[in-house]
Amino acid sequence: MRKVAIIGSGNIGTDLMIKVLRVSDLLEVAAMVGIDPDSDGLARARRLKVQTTHEGVEGLLALDEFDEIDIVFDATSAGAHIKNAETLRKFGKYLVDLTPAAIGPFVVPAVNLTDQLNRNVDNVNMVTCGGQATIPIVAAVSQVTPVAYAEIVASISSKSAGPGTRANIDEFTETTAQAIESVGGAARGKAIIILNPADPPVIMRDTVLCLTGDVDQDAVRDSVSTMVEEVSRYVPGYHLKQEVQFDRVSAADVRTLLPAGVGTVSTQISVFLEVEGAAHYLPAYAGNLDIMTSAALRVGEGIAERLNHAEAPRRSRA
């Protein structure tokens, strides 16, 4: 078991802690780190016999078990992660960043986890909730045909958006758009987030629009279906809301969306998704938070597998 610390005792950090405790055979929570001694996350961690500190990263460094920790999950904010990463850099820990800070490369497990692990980077970024839900679909379409433009709309329950999410709205759109291009493969990406105030709260819904040339529709459907199945391996509540749709478009109608130099655009591909949370700590409607913690858990386990594999020859020689 690889020991991990979680920085951030809010909704995301607490849900991630409970996921590790309940479902992971590779990871062990050694510490929960916060800055509010009265937070529900720290209180819950103490009840679960997890070591805690309310003194932030400095408190983490002071813990007796710090040297035994291999992986640190950061579920704070973009600004806080920059400081946390600088503090932790010299200690040789692997950082999994659940904020939009994007110091390290983007990781979407179903798309590029193996590639990033092979690069031996020590800080990876989980993009955003909308990115984790939609970039696999953009990548699936890109595997079949060049995507000139991809636009995603993430609609989440307002009740599931805590202070961290609200503080990072601008970073959400910028980071997600960048990852649509660099991970999803689109020539240009755009991201929109909607906080839905409906009560009772609705689950996360995502729309992915891709502009392409003429396409083999069956090949796109198969690629999207395969990708949805892959994501659902670590996010069970992830599924298509309806069949993939194809519409003819005029290049003149979409010319303002397209970057220079792309080929002929004739088709709009529309994919509609729902993400229901596992309700480990958060309500089932908070699929936007569940997909982040589920994806982060998958990345953490991937790092643990890599570390275990690297140590196996040394153990056998001993």
From Swiss-Prot:
InterPro entries: Acetaldehyde_dehydrogenase, Acetylaldehyde_DH_C, NAD(P)-bd_dom_sf, Semialdehyde_DH_NAD-bd
Family: Belongs to the acetaldehyde dehydrogenase family.
Binding residues annotated for NAD(+), in chain numbering: 9-12, 160-168, 288
Keyword Oxidoreductase attributed: yes
GO molecular function: acetaldehyde dehydrogenase (acetylating) activity; NAD binding
Keyword match NAD: yes
One of the GO biological process terms: catabolic process
Catalytic class of the enzyme: oxidoreductase
Keywords for this protein: Aromatic hydrocarbons catabolism, NAD, Oxidoreductase
Catalytic reactions of this protein: acetaldehyde + NAD(+) + CoA = acetyl-CoA + NADH + H(+)
Enzyme Commission numbers on file: 1.2.1.10
Identification of the protein by name: Acetaldehyde dehydrogenase 2
Source species: Mycolicibacterium vanbaalenii (strain DSM 7251 / JCM 13017 / BCRC 16820 / KCTC 9966 / NRRL B-24157 / PYR-1) (Mycobacterium vanbaalenii)
Pfam families given in the database record: AcetDehyd-dimer, Semialdhyde_dh
Active-site residues annotated for this sequence: 129 (acyl-thioester intermediate)
